[in-house]
Each structure stands twice: as C-alpha cells, then as structure tokens.
Amino acid sequence: RGSSFCIRRFKDDPFSPADIIAFRTMSSLMVSYLWIAFQNEVPMLFVGGTASGKTTTLNAMCIFIPWQMKIVSIESTREVNIPQPNWVPGLTRQGFGGESTEGVIGEFELLKAALRERPEYIIVGEIRGAEAYVLFQAMATGHCAYSTVHADSVPSLVHRLENKPIDIPRVLLPALEACSIQIQTRINGKRVRRTKQLVEIVGIDPNSLEVITNEVFRWDVTVSYTHLTLPTNSNV
C-alpha cells in the first residue's frame, strides 16, 4: 500500500488546568492537589494507555511549576510546550544516515547531560528503557522529575518498571512519590479521557518488600467525575 505518515496537531495555546477541569478529565479538587504537588517538587509519573491524555495532562499541570525554576525537558518527539522563561528543551537525534549509530543522541545521553545543568525540574516525554534508571537516580538524589509511561494500573506500572527494558530495582521505586492513572473510555457513545486514580507511593514494606500505596482519588463512574476517596493503604 505504500508509505504512510501520521500528523499529530497541537493547539497554538496548550491546554490549561482549567481546560482539564472543563473536559472533566480531572475534578477541581484533584487539580488543586496537583498544584500543591508541583509547587512542592513532588516527583510524579503520568500513567495510561495510548491516547489517554498523559502528555496533555502533564503539560497542562506544568503551569504550576514556579516561574523562577530551571526546567529541562527531554523528548524524542516534541510535545511539551510550557511558558516558563527558564525552560531548556532537549530533543533526541537520529544517526547520520543508514544503519550507522554515529551521531545518535538518545534520551539516556540527554538526561545525563541535563543533570550537569543543575535543573530544578526535569521532564522526560516518556520513559521506555535505560533512561528510566538515570531518571530514578535523579529522583533519589533530590531532583523533581515528571514523565509518562504506558501502563493501566499501579501493579502494571510496578511490573513495567521492574522488568526489562526499563529494569528499575524495587529499592528505587519509593523515589517516585505519586502517579496519575489515566484512561480513554466512552460515555454515552462519546470518547472521553478520565483520571482513574491518583495514587501516592508511601514506601516499601520491610517484611514483604511490597510497594505500599495510598489511593487519594478515584474516578466514580456513576457520576462521571473524579471524587476524593478516604486514604487507603495497599501493597503492590
């Protein structure tokens, strides 16, 4: 059938937190929670399937990063677009033709270089492989980092992070302090995006070595909105 290509169009003005509330992807209470988290440098992952709105939500919430902070973003395809003046965007580069790897600059190399720039916030478009280990090491040493990853729940997120090609040791997982689980679904025949859960990573059980989580928000399907739930600890 020949070659094909995909065009992903973006708004001239990126979606704002107010848009996320208007779309009912999140409630105003959840956005307020993330406002506090972003301003207080809480490392977080935005988790979901393809086209669930992970990067859109991450980009919208970045407006809450204090404007005087230095931000470095790293992507293979340019999607992050934030207004802060002290933002340094980084983009991966392919090799100089053919099968040669000469000249290739990947997310792993960009992330290592970014850590030498003394960033206060690091944004990685998506973690897929070796760059995730460097990102978690950065979190563990006090850097605030945000990224997206393909998974549909906290257990599947832990499974993806611990296994190849990402391969993060379980002892590093508590460096991640929270995650937002997003889904794409249909309501009355209309395709919508919803934040299914917002979960805090509490730590690791010293006896079972299971990851202890605290679910703060959960989407209530019956009212098509995100409601606050009572704190509930569980092991993953």
Range-by-range predicted roles:
Residues 202-225:
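Non-catalytic accessory segments flanking P-loop/AAA+ NTPase cores
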Residues 1-43:
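P-loop NTP-binding catalytic core
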Residues 57:
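Hydrophobic positions on the alpha1 helix immediately C-terminal to the Walker A/P-loop
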Residues 226-232:
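Conserved small/polar residues in nucleotide/adenosyl-binding loops
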Residues 50:
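The conserved Walker
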Residues 171-206:
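Phosphate-binding/switch region of NTP-binding enzymes
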Residues 31, 35, 41-47, 60-185:
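Switch/coupling sub-region of P-loop NTPases
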Residues 53:
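Conserved glycine(s) of the Walker
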